[in-house]
């Protein structure tokens, strides 16, 4: 039987590992379960982790703004990591890994009733494996057992979209969080996320004749998004009176998309998108060490942080761009800084079969198989990388990758 002292040593080792993660994640604040702040989207991570306002069907973005469910174009999608991410590889801990997967479904009510509404639902899972730890007793350093530390969350999300020319969406997530530090030293909590998203298709609204030239239409969209994540609840391992707060966070962002669309097959010949996002942890500490939640906007300033793009010690700024070529190749770059982070640059690449299927359909109008693929199926591969200007940063060479299947009925 493990003694109280043995458990304390185990917990101390585990919290040391968690502290290293906190250094990278919690924006200078002290909160529990900071793994909730890790961006799970390889697509977004290639663009500086900006995701709250981006126009995308990427299922992983639901983890940080459930309103995306109201604006997705596909009826069903699933995304997963083909290989686990080695989290903070600079630490040299091979069994410190991060993994995630998401299932999304959506229906357009306009197909059944004369209301321009759509409803989406999603389930997602995130796992952080903290590695294998030795269990010792109070009598000495002899190992009397081993255990695997891990944290995970399961989330159900619901989103509603309203298309009245301007596209509006809102969403909510219910999340169950479990932190397993050792047998008998486990903790769990519930939290909620709330999100809003607005997309303004400017070119469509102001141009009566969509063609820029024969058969080609311009694309110019602006979007705004915001989300409150990890709302409510605290988590404790021993004493509920000493519970730690969850990493409540406010995100606000804007995005633009420019491009050209081939009308005949509804294919984007080329697109350029850019996003900027500000994040602020809404947890403060009193002088006696107790915690409190700050106001809904915390230290955020729309003018300073979003328009000017200035980061501060309390506010993290993420920004990035993407170039899409024929809905086939996507090239991404970005960065984030502030809120406890030093400068981190990101890059990524995406490959989609959508453009390939649409291109093949141009010369296969009588080929039912090719047309079915073009109209109803899409496969994505996305990967991204983190690097810093510091040779000893734990984040250097962090790599994410995902595979996604999209089906449109």
Which residues fall in each region the model found?
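Subset of outer-membrane beta-barrel
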Residues: 27-409
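Cleavable N-terminal export/targeting peptides
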Residues: 1-41, 408-409
């Amino acid at each position: 039987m493990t003694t109280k002292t043995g458990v304390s040593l185990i917990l101390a080792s585990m919290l040391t590992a968690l502290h290293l993660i906190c250094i990278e994640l919690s924006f200078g604040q002290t909160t529990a379960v900071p793994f909730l702040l890790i961006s799970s989207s390889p697509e977004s991570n290639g663009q500086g982790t900006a995701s709250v306002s981006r126009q995308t069907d990427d299922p992983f973005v639901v983890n940080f703004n459930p309103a995306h469910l109201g604006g997705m174009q596909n009826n069903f999608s699933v995304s997963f990591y083909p290989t686990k991410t080695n989290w903070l590889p600079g630490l040299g801990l091979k069994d410190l890994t991060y993994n995630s997967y998401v299932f999304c479904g959506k229906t357009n009510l306009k197909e059944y009733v004369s209301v321009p509404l759509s409803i989406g639902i999603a389930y997602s899972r995130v796992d952080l494996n903290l590695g294998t730890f030795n269990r010792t007793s109070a009598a000495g350093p002899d190992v009397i057992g081993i255990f695997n530390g891990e944290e995970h969350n399961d989330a159900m999300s619901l989103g509603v979209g309203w298309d009245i020319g301007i596209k509006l969406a809102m969403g909510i997530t219910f999340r169950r969080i479990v932190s397993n530090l050792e047998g008998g030293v486990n903790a769990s909590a519930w939290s909620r996320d709330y999100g809003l998203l607005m997309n303004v298709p400017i070119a469509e609204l102001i141009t009566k004749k969509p063609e820029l030239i024969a058969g080609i239409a311009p694309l110019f969209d602006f979007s705004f998004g915001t989300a409150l994540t990890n709302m409510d609840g605290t988590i404790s391992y021993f004493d509920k009176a000493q519970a730690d707060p969850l990493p409540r966070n406010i995100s606000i962002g804007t995005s633009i998309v420019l491009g050209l669309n081939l009308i005949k097959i509804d294919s984007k010949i080329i697109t350029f998108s850019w996003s900027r996002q500000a994040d602020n942890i809404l947890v403060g500490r009193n002088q006696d060490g107790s915690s409190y939640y700050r106001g809904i906007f915390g230290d955020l300033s729309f003018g300073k942080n979003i328009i000017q793009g200035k980061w501060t010690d309390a506010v993290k700024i993420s920004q990035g761009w993407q170039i899409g070529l024929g809905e086939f190749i996507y090239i991404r770059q970005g960065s984030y800084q502030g809120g406890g982070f030093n400068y981190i640059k990101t890059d990524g690449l995406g490959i989609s079969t959508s453009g390939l299927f649409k291109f093949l359909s141009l010369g296969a109008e009588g080929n039912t198989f090719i047309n079915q693929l073009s109209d109803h199926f899409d496969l994505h591969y996305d990967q991204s990388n983190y690097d810093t200007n510091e040779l000893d940063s734990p984040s250097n060479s962090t790599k994410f990758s995902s595979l996604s299947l999209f089906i449109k009925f």
